[in-house]
């Protein structure tokens, strides 16, 4: 089950709902 908690500011949520680094430094 995915727990709906905020990701860190520099992370994004992937298609599985995981917090993934880093939305400011990649594609």
Curated annotation (Swiss-Prot):
The lineage of its organism: Eukaryota, Metazoa, Cnidaria, Anthozoa, Hexacorallia. One of its GO terms (cellular component) is extracellular region. GO terms for molecular function: potassium channel regulator activity; toxin activity. Belongs to the sea anemone BBH family. The keyword Secreted applies. This is Toxin Bcg III 21.00. Keywords: Ion channel impairing toxin, Nematocyst, Potassium channel impairing toxin, Secreted, Toxin, Voltage-gated potassium channel impairing toxin. Possible voltage-gated potassium channel (Kv) blocker. It comes from the Eukaryota. It comes from Bunodosoma cangicum (Sea anemone). It is found in: Secreted; Nematocyst.
